[in-house]
Regions:
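Sequence/fold signature of self-assembling virion shell proteins
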Residues: 8-15, 22, 48-194
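Long, hydrophobic, well-ordered secondary-structure blocks that form the structural core
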Residues: 1-8
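Structured, hydrophobic secondary-structure cores that serve as assembly/anchoring elements
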Residues: 1, 18-49
Length: 194
């Protein structure tokens, strides 16, 4: 699922077609399931320097979509970057249809798009509010979740920082268990320099 070329020497550590093809083919015969790649703007700049970025105009005209090897390019500078200066390592993400879903309700993992809070709704009353007339407030709680296809969330053996997972918790491999064959998971990652 992850192709890491960041430790290579010179240009071999930089994003390019070889790393892209290696990442796509971690899915074997399902390599065509990838429809988009999310990259940092520095990786997009590398694509431009390599003259590998194509611009496709939609059938209706007017809208242009950047593509790399037939996959739509999403540029987002909030993607993971580690290191500093020339040693920066950028994580690029390949996505297929259904890679990320909404879910959390047992038996309907991708249907409802929300979890089940401990107390989903309650009413509170403040008698002294409203010039003595009182006020009622309805509290409704929802836990919206995004979940990568093919993985289950496990809490055994690792302690979460809070009741709901934090971003730091979501980054820990100890909380994730892949439950379907790698070739069925529409996600792949490339770690490279720009």
């Amino acid at each position: 699922m992850t192709v890491d070329i960041s430790g290579a020497v010179g240009d071999a550590a930089k994003f390019g077609a070889n790393a892209f093809v290696d990442a796509v083919y971690t899915a074997g015969e399902n390599s065509e399931m990838f429809r988009a790649i999310a990259v940092h703007s520095m990786i997009e700049a590398r694509m431009v320097k390599n003259d590998e970025l194509d611009i496709v105009e939609t059938a209706q005209g007017g809208t242009k979509i950047k593509t790399y090897k037939g996959r739509a390019v999403i540029v987002d500078d909030s993607l993971t970057v580690s290191g500093a200066g020339a040693d920066r390592v950028y994580t690029s993400v390949l996505f297929g249809g259904g890679a990320i879903g909404f879910g959390g309700v047992e038996g309907n993992a991708f249907a409802l798009g929300e979890g089940v809070p401990k107390v989903a709704a309650e009413v509170s009353r403040t008698a002294e509010a409203g010039n003595g007339g009182g006020m009622e407030s309805i509290w409704e709680r929802r836990t919206w979740m995004m979940h990568p296809f093919g993985f289950e969330w496990v809490e055994s053996g690792a302690a979460m920082a809070e009741m709901s997972p934090t971003l730091a918790d979501l980054r820990k491999a100890a909380f994730w268990n892949r439950v379907v064959d790698r070739k069925q998971v529409p996600l792949a990652f490339i770690k490279s320099k720009a």
